[in-house]
Amino acid sequence: EEPKPIAKIASGGELSRIMLALKNVIAEKDSIGTLIFDEIDTGVSGRAAQKIGIKLKQISRLRQVLCVTHLAQMAVMADNHLLIEKNIQGDRTVTTVRTLDHEQRKYEIARIMGGENITELMLENAEQYLKDADNM
């Protein structure tokens, strides 16, 4: 098959990961102060998500990184965790953004990993996950 432009054959997630790889290589020379990645982890395994999270953490040492994710492997790597929620109020959709403290963050990581019924074991796992990420 004839080669085609990457923009025509790659998925949104693949394009995001290609961008991540490029940004990781040129971050020191890049004049962009903030990098935004929207669900860069779509369609990847937990292990791949962890590797992406580590790369984003490395980039964040030089640049501000904003990343939307639905995976705990990515969320635990953040220095700051913002929770974005959409709610219906009457006939309107209202979006709220709030910064999570450590306990709220632990709960959110547990929720991402296991759903709405959070157990003490899930919270312990989330706490350990956060500690492990701090050491990476």
Language model features with spans:
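Conserved D-loop-proximal element of ABC-family nucleotide-binding domains
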Residues: 29-30, 42-50
